């Protein structure tokens, strides 16, 4: 017989975070602000993808970006040069954002007059997938050089995302062991409802379809 108590800390943390995330999601819905949580590994092209996306949409809607990093404000500076509002969130060593940190950023930012807010999460394929940020939709970027086996190695990330961008398709000829068919099959096996776009943030390939997806989702959300 045990003479001590076992506390499931991880379960409690997730339960508390999920409740906070649901509350934040409801608040954003009442404001009509669509929050996209954008995730990837470091170097997959989040910021470059975001800059091209902003250039395509900023004349149609009011956009804001929250940049999350352990340190530095390089990405926030790059985004601010596009002309949209941007803030930098330093996570203090944390490898992800949770709902409370997202709420703090939202408060500082002020989103009531924004249609579309992108949260560029910390570059990591593990921790960000575990914590609900309160976002409307989750998106991730997988770059061709990372390999088509990433859905097998990081299944949770691919399971929780509404949309997956396969980036750097302009160098597919160099990485000829990357199979578009295999990566698509592996993603859909984990997540049959996921939308998948093959894109290049460098050339713009696939960005018309990606931008149309954003327009459609925001339109449905704000009705």
Show where each model-derived region lies.
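Canonical P-loop GTPase G-domain recognition
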Residues: 172-223
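Nucleotide-state-sensitive switch-loop elements of NTP-binding domains
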Residues: 3-26, 31-39, 44, 48, ...
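Cofactor-binding loop segments of dinucleotide-utilizing enzymes, especially the Rossmann-like FAD-
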Residues: 68, 143-144, 201
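Short, glycine/polar-rich helix-capping loops at beta-to-alpha or helix-loop-helix junctions
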Residues: 72-76, 150-154, 179-186
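Short beta->alpha connector loops at strand-helix junctions that form conserved
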Residues: 88-91, 142, 167
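Phosphate-binding/switch region of NTP-binding enzymes
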Residues: 156-158, 165
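Conserved Switch II/interswitch segment of TRAFAC-class P-loop GTPases
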Residues: 96, 124-127, 134-152, 162, ...
């Amino acid at each position: 017989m045990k003479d001590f108590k076992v506390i499931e800390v991880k379960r409690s943390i997730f339960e508390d975070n999920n409740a906070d995330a649901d509350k934040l999601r409801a608040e954003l819905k009442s404001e009509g602000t669509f929050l996209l949580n954008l995730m990837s590994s470091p170097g997959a092209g989040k910021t470059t993808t975001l800059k091209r996306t902003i250039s395509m949409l900023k004349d149609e809607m009011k956009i804001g970006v929250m940049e999350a990093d352990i340190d530095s404000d390089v990405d926030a500076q790059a985004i601010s040069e596009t002309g949209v509002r941007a803030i930098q969130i330093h996570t203090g060593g944390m490898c992800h954002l949770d709902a409370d940190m997202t709420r703090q950023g939202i408060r500082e930012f002020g989103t009531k007059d924004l249609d579309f807010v992108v949260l560029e999460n910390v570059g990591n394929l593990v921790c960000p997938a575990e914590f609900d940020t309160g976002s409307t939709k989750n998106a991730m970027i997988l770059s061709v050089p990372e390999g088509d086996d990433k859905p097998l190695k990081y299944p949770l990330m691919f399971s929780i995302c509404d949309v997956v961008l396969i980036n750097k398709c302009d160098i597919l000829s160099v990485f000829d062991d990357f199979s578009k068919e295999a990566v698509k099959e592996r993603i859909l096996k984990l997540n049959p409802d996921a939308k998948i776009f093959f894109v290049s943030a460098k050339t713009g390939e696939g960005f018309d379809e990606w931008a149309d997806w954003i327009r459609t989702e925001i339109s449905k959300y704000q009705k």
